[in-house]
């Protein structure tokens, strides 16, 4: 992958994943995000540290399978490919995913 400019770092984080399993992982300081398929762990680590001002200990990545979708009556297409990134933070850092109002 080409060198990433710091202004492009927020584009590497597509969204956070909120499911029952990922909420349980929050107790152990593991946060789950979606990223584009071509992003490396090093670039994603820089994006998380720059955007949330936290220290990342480790990152695990999973390539999600390609999903098929019907387009019209006979044709099939595919949905965009994503990578799931599980980020483990330092013990003193947190990311506030839920807004308290």
From Swiss-Prot:
Which Gene3D superfamilies does the record match to this protein? Answer: 3.30.70.330
Q: Name one GO biological process term.
A: translation
Q: Domain of life, per the record? A: Eukaryota
Q: Key word Ribosomal protein present in the record?
A: yes
Q: Which GO terms describe its molecular function?
A: rRNA binding; structural constituent of ribosome
Which Gene Ontology cellular component terms are annotated?
A: chloroplast; ribonucleoprotein complex; ribosome
User: By its UniProt entry, which Pfam families does this protein fall under?
Assistant: Ribosomal_L23
List the keywords (alphabetical). Chloroplast, Plastid, Ribonucleoprotein, Ribosomal protein, RNA-binding, rRNA-binding
Under InterPro entries, the record lists: Nucleotide-bd_a/b_plait_sf (IPR012677), Ribosomal_uL23-like (IPR013025), Ribosomal_uL23/eL15/eS24_sf (IPR012678)
Localization recorded for this chain is:
Plastid, Chloroplast
State its role.
Binds to 23S rRNA.
Concerning HAMAP family, the annotation shows: Ribosomal_uL23_B (MF_01369_B)
Give the UniProt family note.
Belongs to the universal ribosomal protein uL23 family.
Q: How does it assemble?
A: Part of the 50S ribosomal subunit.
Q: What is this protein called?
A: Large ribosomal subunit protein uL23c
- What organism does the record attribute this protein to? Cyanidium caldarium (Red alga)
The gene behind this protein is: rpl23
